[in-house]
Every structure is written in C-alpha cells, then in structure tokens.
Regions:
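Internal gly/pro-rich beta-alpha loop/helix module
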Residues: 102-214
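ATP-dependent carboxylate-amine ligase catalytic core
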Residues: 3-88, 96-119, 132-136
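Glycine-rich phosphate-binding P-loop
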Residues: 1-3, 222
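C-terminal and late-domain segments of enzyme folds
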Residues: 216-218, 230-240, 247, 333-336, ...
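A short helix->loop->beta-strand "cap" motif at the edges of active sites that frequently abuts
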Residues: 90, 146, 294-298
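Phosphate-binding active sites in nucleotide-utilizing proteins
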Residues: 218-294
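Residues that mark the start of a beta-strand
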Residues: 13-17, 219-221, 247, 323
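Cysteine-nucleophile active-site neighborhood
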Residues: 248, 272-346
Length: 411
C-alpha cells in the first residue's frame, strides 16, 4: 500500500521521501524502488528523537510529500508507530484490511482514532476491498468526524511475494515495478483529500545545524559486502561511517574472487543460507577474508555475515556448506523464528543499540566477550564474539546510536 501511494505521487511529478518505522531492511528496498529516493529508518529507541527529527527535517526541505510506513499495528511495540506520530505531530492514516468486513470497519476506525486522545489521527484507508459496492458499505460505516482517504481492491497480481524473514528483496522480486505501477493505478480516491500540512520548522522543528563527527575514520577504506546474500544495511550506518572520514567500497562474497583494497570489512546480514553452494565454492574469497583477518585488520560481522564466518552453515533441508572458518563453530537454520527484538550491548568501545531477528541457532567454540540486553524484560540475550580484530554477533548494530564507538570497531 505504501509503495503504491509513493509511486502514485511520483508518477504525478512529486518528489516523495518515504521512511520506515522501526528496524526493517526488506520493506525499505521495495519502498526505495517505488519512490525512487533513498529510505531511512525512524526508530526512537535505536536512534533517539533528535536523530529522527534531523532526518525528517532534512527530508522536508527537499520533498513534496513525506510518507512514513508504520511497523506492525499502530500501537504495537515500545516505542510504537503512534509514539512517532505523536512526537512529531504527523497525521496518521490507518490502513485497514477490509477482507470479509462491513460495519466493523467503522468500529475499528473509531477505536483506533480514540485509543489515544493526543494522537493526530487523520483518517482511514480501506485495503483489499472486494468491489465498489463493498467500499460503499465500508465508507458508510466510518464516523463522520473521520476522513476516508480512499481504497484499494484485492488483487493477487499486486501482492508481493514473501519468505521466512519477510518480503523478497527488491532485486529478487519478479516484475516488481510492474506490480507497484499496477497497484498505484488501482488506488481509488487518494487524490481527493489530503491531511493537514505539517510545517516542520514552525510547528515541530526549529532550524538546527547538522551534527558533525570527528574524522576518526579518515583514510580508512571499508569493504562492505552487498549482494543477494548480504544486503541488510542501514543507510544511516554507511552515512555515519562516511561522515567520519571512511571510504566505502562495495564487494560481493558471491561473485568476486578477491577483496577490494581495504583496511576493514563490514559483513552485514542477509540470506547466506539461500546461497550455500556459491558461497562455499568461492574458495578465493574465503581465503582472502582469512588473510585480511590474519593481517590484523578489522572485521564487523552481523547476523548472516557472522554465519558466513563460521566453519559451516546448514539450511532447513539439511544441506551443508563450508564457510570461511574464522569463527570455530557451526549454525543450522530453523523453521521458526529463534530471536527477535531491540537490544543494547556494552562493549569496551561504548554502548550500542540495535536489533536481532533470525531463524538460526549457532554453536561457537569461543567464549562470548559480552551479551546483549533486550529492551523487553523477557527477551533473550545475544552473545558477542571477538577473535582478534573481528567483532561478530547476531545483532544488527545501529551506528547512529553510538557513532564514535562504531568507528572504533573498524580501526
């Protein structure tokens, strides 16, 4: 729905900036394709309100329209999408799945609108509508004080394919642009009414200079893995590294035989389990990563990037692949989610915030140097491993949570 709305306005000549609430990698890939503009995550716990405020303020200076896609339900999580909307006074349009629903649609709309009195609730949008007459029933159920922002019919041709971690990556989705374009063309009533304009400068934001960071990474070239196996990257992470002086050089553990000429490596998460044969067969790349480590150079490996550095990785079908072998141990993919949530961890460099989300279990023969702490009291801690200048964990670090400490990981 958000992708369709972004493309709808883009097709009409507007510059659209889209943000994603919370720690997500897959939805942003789709939304970037739809809007044609870079996407950043807004997470009040990981990045803080000043960081989120700055991102929105900068986007408002260049965009005609800002869309923010929520995460889960409007009030789910702590912080939740409603918290973000309330803090920055951003109008909320609730997208409600209307499948097998009539008057209950209005009851849901009224409940969402009144659940928190301070929430700037603007109205509702009906998704997966069966027909024009079905929409009329839905519209008649909406209380008069609420606005209907339109509707989208149910259509299998615009449904985006998924797998165990969520949507397929944009690069893997067949006919993605065609699906988005069709969804945008199918939107009904979205141009009829718009919410009240948010004046960031006078109503929520004041002019502020962009935060500057010491050039701790000046002259440091960082090789960042980016391909179909490793693609879970926050733009804000790369921006912070560059702002501190680093030069980013992308490479592919799947397709390249050697590393670029770099002083440090960043192996983000992704889907190494879907590319076992190719990763296992690329002996030259594995050897070059080992040589990089043996030379005393830094490596930061997150989630799938960490699994790649183990001795072996086994998928859910029992297929096994020989990995890099820098971390003594093995991992096996699981059919069910094994950990999820926001986490913080205190390392000698400083305290980091981030999140974990994975379907694997691993055994490592070295002792962790630290364990993360879940933001939820009942969350499961994640171990952090160190081997020389290698730092590895299931955690996806959010570098803006501790920029200078993040720089130290790559030195």
């Amino acid at each position: 729905m958000t992708a369709a709305l972004a493309r709808y306005h883009r097709d009409r000549g507007r510059r659209v900036r889209v943000f994603k609430t919370g720690p997500d990698f897959l939805d942003p890939m789709i939304l970037e394709r739809a809007s044609g503009e870079p996407l950043y995550q807004l997470d009040l716990w990981m990045g803080g309100d000043v960081h989120c405020r700055q991102l929105l303020y900068e986007a408002a200076g260049e965009a005609d329209l800002i869309l923010i896609e929520g995460v889960m339900g409007l009030f789910d999580g702590n912080p939740c999408s409603a918290d973000l909307a309330t803090l920055f006074n951003i109008p909320v349009m609730a997208v409600i799945d209307s499948t097998a629903m009539a008057q209950t649609f209005g009851a849901l709309a009224l409940g969402l609108a009144g659940y928190r009195s301070e929430l700037p609730f603007a109205g509702v949008f009906a998704n997966r509508v069966a027909s024009q007459s079905h929409y009329q029933m839905l519209a008649e159920s909406i209380p008069p004080e609420l606005t209907s922002f339109g509707w989208l019919a149910r259509d299998a041709d615009i449904t985006l394919p998924e797998r165990h971690l969520g949507l397929l990556q944009a690069i893997e989705s067949d006919n993605l642009d065609e699906r988005i374009e069709k969804a945008a063309a199918a939107l009904n009533g979205v141009g009829d009414v718009m919410p009240e304009t948010v004046n960031f400068e006078t109503r929520t934001f004041s002019k502020q200079s962009k935060v500057s960071y010491p050039l701790h990474l000046k002259g440091v070239r960082i090789g960042v893995a980016r391909d179909q196996a490793f693609a879970f990257l926050y733009r804000s992470n790369l921006d912070i590294l560059v702002e501190m002086g680093a030069e980013i050089k992308f490479f592919s553990p799947l397709n390249d035989s050697v590393l670029p000429d770099v002083e440090a490596l960043y192996l983000p998460g992704g889907y190494p389990e879907l590319h076992l044969d190719s990763l296992a067969a690329n002996e030259l790349m594995k050897a070059d990563i080992c040589a990089h480590h043996a030379a005393g150079k830094a490596i930061v490996a997150e989630c799938g990037g960490m699994l790649y550095l183990l001795d072996s990785l086994t998928d859910t079908e029992g297929r096994n692949g020989s990995m890099v072998g820098l971390l003594p141990g093995k991992a096996e993919m699981q059919a069910r989610l094994t950990n999820l949530g926001l986490h913080s961890v205190a390392l000698p460099e400083g305290e980091f915030r981030g999140h974990t989300f994975h379907h694997s279990r691993m055994q490592c023969d070295i002792e962790p140097v630290a364990y993360s702490e879940s933001a939820r009291h009942h969350g499961t801690p994640e171990p952090i491993f160190r081997q020389g200048k290698l730092t590895a964990s299931y955690l996806h670090f959010y570098f803006p949570s501790s920029p200078e400490a993040s720089a130290c990981l790559f030195l």
